[in-house]
From Swiss-Prot:
This is Thymidylate kinase. Its EC number is 2.7.4.9. Belongs to the thymidylate kinase family. GO terms for molecular function: ATP binding; dTMP kinase activity. The keyword Plastid does not apply. It comes from the Bacteria. It comes from Xanthomonas euvesicatoria pv. vesicatoria (strain 85-10). It holds the Pfam family Thymidylate_kin. One of its GO terms (biological process) is dTDP biosynthetic process. InterPro entries: P-loop_NTPase (IPR027417), Thymidylate_kin-like_dom (IPR039430), Thymidylate_kinase (IPR018094). Phosphorylation of dTMP to form dTDP in both de novo and salvage pathways of dTTP synthesis. It catalyses: dTMP + ATP = dTDP + ADP. ATP binds at residues 16-23.
Amino acid sequence: MTIELKPGGLLIAIEGIDGAGKTTLARRLATTLDAAGARVVLSKEPTNGPWGTQLRQSAATGRLSAEEEAELLIRDRHEHVDTLIAPALARGDIVILDRYFPSMVAYQGAAGLPLDELLERNAFAPRPDVLLLLDLPPPTGLARIRARGDAPNHFETQDNLERCRTIFAALDLPGKHVVDASADADSVLRQAHAIIVAALADRLSGDAHTDTGKAALELLSGGRPA
């Protein structure tokens, strides 16, 4: 059974400081929802496009100013929205993003740019229907980064991650859910999966109370997290 959503789909953004487990959760959610019959598009920011590639290179060197990084992020996001996010939502797909504009607000805000201006510059970007904020103490995130063999970049200092965590917590956006990312990966997945199934109830192409809608919800909620 293919699970059909209404036009507009469902936009899920997974956010949090470095080391919180965003990429792992995004991939496992995509696998779980796909196995249940949903059409899923998995993407990330920065993207692999020219602006995103330049940003990742700068993260290793720290040579760009916060304003220069913000400008590249906006260019990257415009392209991402136009070429992938908006078309997928129009088809009624579930779009899962490993980072989105809240990361720009948190990280560039932690670098000193005004939060209200950062939000205003992202007004063009579709707002997530579900914003999963993976909350984690920075020392734990840094320990995870080192455990996987990576050297922390210039963003990944405890002081900077503390500032980012504070901004993430203060963001007042619809659809925001805080998930304890210090729990094991399976527990985090179960929490996130339950939140998404609840959000999907009114997005199904068949009403959730019809036989088709009930069957779709049963598949989604009964699908074992991968």
